[in-house]
């Protein structure tokens, strides 16, 4: 009898808690964006991708280094830069440095602007109060430095109230330029946590991971240039290849290096902005596609198209978030340029000339800028062991990434299952929290879509429309199977309650190749019910 009672109790708990990952007969998984994943899920995604690539023998040249117990990122140096005065602003460059340094410099400049604005407000308040407040500011600065040395390694140096707000909702921003206030501190913290080499994030690192999605980490110069090209350069013939003004490009580059508020408007030349974007990636100290994965990316050129895309997906998962986010932004604009390569008929019926820049032409331009040889690759000959020329392989890889940019940054259902199982093994409570939060988000989105559909559908009378919108056309019966009408904000207003609701109805699994996901990525919803 005791074994039977134990088995019955286990079955009851499984039914109540929703079961372990991989057992979910009532729901179907779908492709999700990597931007909807929490920091913990991103780490588990990297682990799953690493083991999958090792099994496929794509990481033969990759030698991960284990993290030492004393390993920590240069958080002190980053914070000390933020606390420095205006005299060091000129040293915070944008071009010719590592991608992570570009992001940190942008954060530092933003913080300096905030500090200068605060000091000006204090000086305007009066000399008596400004002297006292200046002394308090100095005390706060030394207090921060003291906490950096004496605090625990994994403890975030953030105000308690801001940390609580950060746990309740994720930071969501299209670029670093859109982050406001305390989000700058959280962004710096996330940047310091992910700045380890790929191997150290996978092997031996015991840092605590957040359950919030990672804010997108895209340099301002990349976002500004890509937005300008999308608005003004899609129909420009020979974009990225024709001549440009070196003087104007040098001036723009100096303005970005000086941290000025550069605005790219109609007065700018498209070819100058395109050349500036190329120079940023060409002069970057590291490679946008990490040096450690150089040979692995080249090896994908020997595969069939579908197998190549699957391998490229895994390699993208393995990249640091700042690299993958910047790569996605670049591939998105390059894909739009390639879509406008041929002549077309505009809305007004006039002929619109194409830019003549196919994905192959764009890959020829950006292949060597995105795939740079690392220390290990430089020792190799011009051809890999498989007999493929490095340049030809790089063009093939970049072309495939441009053509399928919207698929590379999605997670297919079978990878979702692996990630969910790894999260379950490390922390069942974390997986339960992520499930409940994602369920509330999806329910809110579904309710909003239903209300939008009701508003868009024609109705016979205004009374019927009002009743349909308010959910009063038919009273809700407690014994019926229908849902009561829920206001749009209801699911978000009960963050501390249990995630309850009707079963989620998801779309059918979609194919791997050429999946449009523009609308789906904007929702930022990750859902792990494999």
Curated annotation (Swiss-Prot):
Domain of life, source organism: Eukaryota
Signal is among the record's keywords: yes
Oligomer status and interactors: May interacts (via the Rho-GAP domain) with the active form of RAC1.
Pfam families assigned: RhoGAP
PROSITE patterns, alphabetized: RHOGAP (PS50238)
Source organism: Bos taurus (Bovine)
GO MF term (any one): GTPase activator activity
Protein name: Rho GTPase-activating protein 36
GO terms classed as biological process: signal transduction
PANTHER family per the UniProt record, alphabetical: RHO GTPASE-ACTIVATING PROTEIN 36, RHO-GTPASE-ACTIVATING PROTEIN 6 FAMILY MEMBER
Region (Disordered): 471-512
Organism ancestry: Eukaryota, Metazoa, Chordata, Craniata, Vertebrata
